[in-house]
């Protein structure tokens, strides 16, 4: 296979990584040789499944020091995805009250989202899980309420005796839950998704004036957006939270 493929089309794969800086460019100001950093990569460059990798300083930060390299390397992509949805797309403030529903609370992104919400906001966190082990998992992460995603979500939320969630963060199978989300979300709420539903009819959300938000953590580096440095900033804060034992 390799013999018959063009070298011009070859790509080195790999996203999440921890590494030690061995060389810096002339315009780099935030890091020095010897720094241990973590990051999630860039779609426009070769990936981390290699001994050496060139990475833009705006999308990396110093890694947390209280966990192993292997443990740290498992976090950047899910942490960036969760952070950007919660604080960039939804723009949740630290003092805001209300509730949020996370569909897929036991998954990688959902697990980080729960912890970020408990560490940095006052929102009541409702997470979905169905098996006993996943229910226990999301509870251990700090979810205030756990509901079964295989059952009627709206009915379960109503039995909790709390207001309809203003935010719904759907991490998977969004097309399965669309009709339920329309019913359970608060008027003028926000729906965020990270998966790729085959069909997605947004018209039912019009009556409630719901805003729809997609999140792809590679967008900033892919388009070299003016706020690309935000990923360095958020990874720095995530590392601080890890070292503080809050993630």
Please identify what each model-predicted range represents.
Residues 75-151:
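Mid-domain Rossmann-like dinucleotide-binding core that forms the NAD(H)/NADP(H) cofactor-binding site
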Residues 30-33, 96-97, 187:
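Short, flexible surface segments
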Residues 40-104:
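NAD(P)H dinucleotide-binding glycine-rich loop of Rossmann-like/cofactor-binding domains
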Residues 93-95, 141, 145-215:
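Glycine-rich cofactor phosphate-binding loops and adjacent beta1-alpha1 units
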Residues 2-44:
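Glycine-rich beta-strand-centered segment in the early N-terminal region that forms part
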């Amino acid at each position: 296979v390799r013999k018959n493929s063009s070298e011009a089309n070859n790509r080195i794969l790999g996203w999440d990584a921890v590494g030690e800086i061995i060389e810096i460019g002339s315009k780099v100001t935030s890091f020095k040789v010897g720094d241990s950093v973590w990051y999630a990569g860039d779609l426009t460059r070769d990936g981390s499944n290699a001994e050496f990798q060139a990475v833009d300083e705006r999308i990396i930060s110093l890694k947390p020091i209280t966990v192993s390299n292997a443990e740290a390397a498992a976090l950047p992509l899910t942490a960036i995805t969760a952070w950007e949805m919660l604080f960039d797309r939804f723009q949740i403030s630290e003092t805001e009250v209300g509730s949020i529903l996370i569909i897929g609370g036991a998954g990688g992104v959902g697990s980080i989202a729960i912890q970020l919400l408990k560490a940095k906001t006052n929102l009541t966190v409702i997470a979905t899980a169905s098996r006993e082990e996943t229910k226990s998992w999301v509870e251990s992460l700090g979810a205030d309420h756990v509901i079964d995603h295989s059952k009627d979500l709206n009915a379960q939320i109503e039995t909790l005796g709390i207001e309809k969630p203003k935010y719904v963060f759907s991490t998977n199978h969004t097309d399965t839950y669309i009709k339920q989300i329309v019913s359970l979300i608060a008027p003028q709420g926000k729906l965020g998704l990270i998966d790729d539903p085959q069909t997605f009819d947004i018209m039912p959300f019009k009556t409630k004036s719901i805003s729809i938000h997609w999140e792809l953590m590679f967008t900033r580096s892919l388009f070299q957006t003016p706020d690309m440095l935000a990923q360095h900033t958020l990874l720095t804060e995530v590392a601080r939270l890890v070292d503080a034992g809050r993630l």
